[in-house]
C-alpha cells in the first residue's frame, strides 16, 4: 500500500534581504505518519515550517494539502487549512489561564459571556484529561513550569483539531516522563490518521518515532527516505554534506 501525501511543498524559496534562507525547497509529509525533518542549525527547517504556518510568506513555490493547492499568507490561513504548529519558543500569555490560551483568538468564546467561557473551560479540561496532560485548565499560565508550558503549547495544537501538526524540537524542555507522554500523544495522532511533522536533532527520537525522514542543508532539500532505509551515519552525512568518516581521519602510526 502506497502512503498518501498529506502535504506537498514545491519549489519554496525565501530571501531576507540578500540572504537566501530557502532555495527551491521540495518537501513532502505523509498522512498518518511521523515525518521527521532534520538539518543542522541554519539549514532552513524552521523557516520552511513558518512558511507552512503562515508566519512568513514565501517568495516562490506552492503548497498542496491533500492534493489541493492552498494559499497560506497568514496564520489564520494555515489554521483554516488544518495546520497547527508547536513552536520551540513558548508563545503563551502568562497572565491568562490555560483555557484562555488554548482558545486565544476565538472571539466566539470571549464575546458570548460567562456561559460559553464556562463551557470552554470544561472542553479544555476534557481535552487535557483525554491526552493525559496533568494541567488545570483554570490555572494561570505564569504558575506552570516551563515543561508544563511546553505541553500546553502542544495542547493548543490539539485544541485546533488540526490535520497536520508541526512540532519544532518539542522535547527540548520536557522531563523523561513528559517525553514519554508526548510520544504517546504522537502515536495517538497518527492512529487518528493525522500527520505529524517532527523537527529534531536527537537521533534516538528520529528512529523511535519516525516513519519518514527528510534532510535540509543550507536552505535546500537534500533528500527524503523511509526511516527503515537510513542509518545514523547516513543521516549525519546528508546533513553535513560529506562522509562522516572524513571528519575523523585515521591517525598514521
What do the predicted segments below correspond to?
Residues 2-253:
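Glycine-rich phosphate-binding loops of nucleotide-dependent enzymes
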